[in-house]
């Protein structure tokens, strides 16, 4: 078993002064060939001499060390195709991959032994060990046989399947030779070199038998091709690693390789630095099938994906490694591709192992990653002998070095014992590489490939050679000197055949690990400034001159470094001085050998390279002037960067000297005007002008002058500027490398000053040029200020999100842009600013610029800055700093913000405060009381009656309080949570207080349910986002005696998802006391938290509480029926939307079976209703999978149903749903002549609910019509059926036809003949009332939270008609009382539906009606309907009926005529005796069903102020609609079943309150006008709504755009598209940040169209400032003219401050032409900036103050 690598940090052996590495661990060797430094990651890889340990080091610091129990084959940095920045260690049977970018790691186990490994551009090439063996049953080692065409396999990603290397052509004697045994040939072929990066293309194979090197051109097949030469040929018969003469395998990769790939692999993902190698093993399969007609490698197009296997395909190792690592047993046959097989890790017997290995021979690879084309070969000398066949032994003597130079690639082949050395070269001609003959056969022109010897001037025996790390085309050659103890080193460029001067080195530098020291002997510039100069020289000159110039610079640099002080160790000036020295010596004539100048630089003058360059007349006449022009253009480039003044000055000094020495016009010297001082003087001076150099221009090109000439008010003609691309006669791409700023700014100015330019275009232009804010700030004043002015204009008017917004000071738009970009990239984590970068293995943050790893932090400030940047991941500019002060968006809808926003939303009056007082169950109830009685005893008795009614209201207040106070608390873990108890005290207007006691005055069951509702409301106050709500916290708040309060609290916590991790012992501690309400709250709460999870443990717990789920013969556990009812709903929640057939059958059985309660079989309707709900939840939306119309013949109802127009995109048919629907419809629609034992009537409502959930929103007309109520038929035929069933059927029918629910009165009153049977109230109208209720309830859910005023007004008109009849005493006959009872239900449904439509709006019109019902006690014992003699009567003597003025919302204008009747007469006629005022108080029964009324009013008040007015009901998902439907079940009559479901709306809410905040302060901004473009729900037309914040947004799916426009703030507009919807945009919180406008620099500024206007205004302003010109400037030290003008004119602009600094009195140096034009750019454009101020300042600088 491969052991876990041990890791430790220690220090690397240190380098001594002579380059030898010593220290505590002398056994470490630098691995040159595996130090790749891909992607900018720096560091070296050191391998121990025993090959079992590897170190990753940066400079002298060891970042990580790994030790293994077997030898390391390969270690280094790799960029996999889709997983960049990896550190990989390859062992014989496993590879360890460490992701440097995210700090994770994984292991890749191989199903075969690995002999060697090679890096390549997209991953690793693995060479299988051909000598691997296994132990048979007789304990004899036998070799493992495998197909050698799979000898080399690619790995492009740790989690990807293997790939194949394929060779295309048939080359004589090559791998694909028709002659010879293919197996023997492949056995002897050894890959010795493969290009490790994308810039190189040549791979080399060694034929060990014939000693022939074969060169192959490689192509990497990937989705992202990095170089030309992609395979595009579509037809060829050549094969991959296969014999051309084998007709049976001429199809390339065999079909076996294209079958299911059962590569077994163990892969373990490890976070951070933890390593877990106990990986779970799994077998996956994938199909990479290849059509029979496409067997060649050229059939794949270049853009297609290389694989069809899943990226998660696993590979599992077998037990063939010498380490005896465990492997899975069993052979995976292709016939079991679809069978998930899980094997234990056990030793593998040899027959099974051999079978598995044979299978891997066929399926080991999935596709081709690399295609090789043989192009050349080389026969090695016979004296080269290989003593071993192992690659390490071969490469220890035979060296291969790969070089690349422009479009040429070379390989240096060096055999150290025999000193054999050859250079193989190829010209990479694109036309040839893309040709079909080359791709197939490797055909190429004769001179394209050549073999050369090393052409050294001094022949010597080469001891070692290396590639210079920074000069990849140059070799470092180490050779013997004249004496054997002397050694020399030099650079050699085989492409231009130039050798650098040799340097003597010590013998230690000829040994291993000496490369770093050797490279220091031949330095290369480290500063970007000098590198840029060298790169410019490379483009201007020939390769020979460039290499020669570099070699001369190295000599000059060494000379200057040797003469410098000890404290000088190089740097920018030293590198530039060496650069200037070489150019100066080339420009100046060679002095006499006796001259001091000659002796000073004799070492350079006498170099052959220098003399060769001086003798070349073309260099003198043409090359050097072009170099000077190029350096001048670089200086102009640096003039556009205020941070590069040092570089600008250094180039100016040299160019002034060079132009003078070359005899160019004086304009060139005067243009530079260097600020000379003793330290900065150049060491060379032109002695005389040299006329041999031509000068291309009379005056130097000036970038600022050219820009100035483009402007509108320029006083000079258009002045062109010579670009670098024109100088070197190439395309403009070179300008982006050498002079990017010049290229960008010239293009920008041309576009900005075009006739059709608008400020709106500037962001797009700057974005196309990739100019960011940091770069813009570094441009000089003349360029920066006009651009800033344009951006300021755009900043003030821009409202929509665009690209490159960081250029503007619009943090609000930047924030919106970040959200939108994260949505588009499916990166939700970017929404949270707290995101932090992962760490590397060494726990060092991986910076964006990975090259920073190579540098040590300079100081503590740098370290802290990197930590801050990594932690915040935001740029430290002004906008980001402002954003960092804002709290996380996850808190915007919670706690304190909710409470504050509630006061803002309902700030116009005290409606919210009043509703809170109505719902606060823990406070005494203020009772509205009015009476016609005069005797104290009667009044007191009536008050007691009112107190009882108010006690019922208090018991239901928790239903509404939980909705109003939803998510307003986030308790801390140490906080003791207190549930306020019910307060059953009623306070009357005369301060009389009456206390209601249980069970004396009110039923104990009602009080317990009141406590339960109070507990639920307390739990709902705790936000879903609250943390620390664990089982321990819940147990900490557990009361000593369990009660209904705590049971409800558990349900409230569960509804918000806080019971997911409740420990088992906590569950049993709660269930053991067998408290009914505790058990109900716990089971339903846990089921809600774990809905849809089908958690097995919770299923067992619930099953114990369901008698029907217990095994037959189980003892009677005496489980309360209400608990069983809650348990069956909990089972449906657990199986939510699972469509579990077995559970569906079990639940359906409960719908039609009798229940054993106390040894009595009962058909409890509440239990069956719960079973129907549970069955619907399990199969929620299952009916949407139907395609065809419903077959009504299944029920024997005939074929007279309308055609089903329902259609769905899901083509699957499930017989289970048809059978289930058939059974449910049979329950609903069947009629029976005799009564059945199981009482099907009690199952009908449950069956209707189940059908509704099955076909919810499916628009299935067939099912809907079966449920729909035919009012005309019912009223005509008087069909005997339960009236309330009509309400449920009509409700379900309309919920199925979701899209067809109307929003007008005609939808409610359809088929209702208003003129018939309305003369009096009787039970004949019950079908109409129940049908209306069902339609209104569907309408309320359909348009929930829409705020539809049309629907509101319709429902208000209806409720106003029925309110006078609510609990109206009237006649006491049964028919009338039943009718009034149905009107009560209808009114309750209307009130709840109204509140759902106007959810969270606090609508006053709705509130008035609900408040009336909530506060007024009506019924037969109320004086509300009593006759009160009026002082004024009409002529006929009819008495007016008035109501108490203390009752708000009570109006008598709409009372029906029946109220004029005498209630006393009615009571007397019915035998009612009211002389005894206490007679009716003895009965505790709620005769008039006040409890049901208060459930509806509390629910309505809760919805009306849901979440303090900041939450909305979500109807976009089936689950949300189902939960909302469960909470508004119209069970308002005794015995009020399923009260616990009244809180399930909490799983159907979403925060939708829009809050506007100031992005600078994070404070809320109120009363912000918002303009919404919303799609109407029914008409589907877009309308504009204007609202003010904080406010409730409509359904996110309906919002098309949102616009914020407030005085003093920047406008903001977000338009939603398919790419990012409003729901996505507000997923992190319904908050929008806006930015306050700063004082515009353009306010009160004049606009000037031409120079004349500016001059007139300038003279006027100069005249106004004449008083300041007389000031004694000598007495005003430090006060310049500019500061006086700024103070007097009120200029508040940093531009003037910078201008003042530039033109300060202490600066006596005259401005150069470039600086003058730069300042001229400030005031030459037509804009609204500070032109006048800048002109005035320049005028004072030029002429000074003058007295009048």
Swiss-Prot record:
Compartments, as annotated in UniProt: Nucleus; Cytoplasm; Cytoplasm, Cytoskeleton, Spindle pole
A biological process from GO: metaphase/anaphase transition of mitotic cell cycle
Annotated Polar residues bias: 1435-1450
Biased composition (Basic and acidic residues): 1451-1468
Keywords associated with the record: Cell cycle, Cell division, Cytoplasm, Cytoskeleton, Mitosis, Nucleus, Phosphoprotein, Ubl conjugation pathway
Main location: nucleus
Stretches the record annotates as Disordered: 1-24, 1435-1479
Pathway in which this enzyme or protein is active: Protein modification; protein ubiquitination
Phosphoserine carried by residues: 1462
Assembly and binders: The APC/C is composed of at least 13 subunits that stay tightly associated throughout the cell cycle: APC1, APC2, APC4, APC5, APC9, APC11, CDC16, CDC23, CDC26, CDC27, DOC1, MND2 and SWM1. APC1 interacts directly with MND2.
Role according to the record: Component of the anaphase promoting complex/cyclosome (APC/C), a cell cycle-regulated E3 ubiquitin-protein ligase complex that controls progression through mitosis and the G1 phase of the cell cycle. The APC/C is thought to confer substrate specificity and, in the presence of ubiquitin-conjugating E2 enzymes, it catalyzes the formation of protein-ubiquitin conjugates that are subsequently degraded by the 26S proteasome.
Similarity comment: family membership: Belongs to the APC1 family.
Misc: Present with 178 molecules/cell in log phase SD medium.
Protein name, per record: Anaphase-promoting complex subunit 1
Gene from which the chain derives: APC1
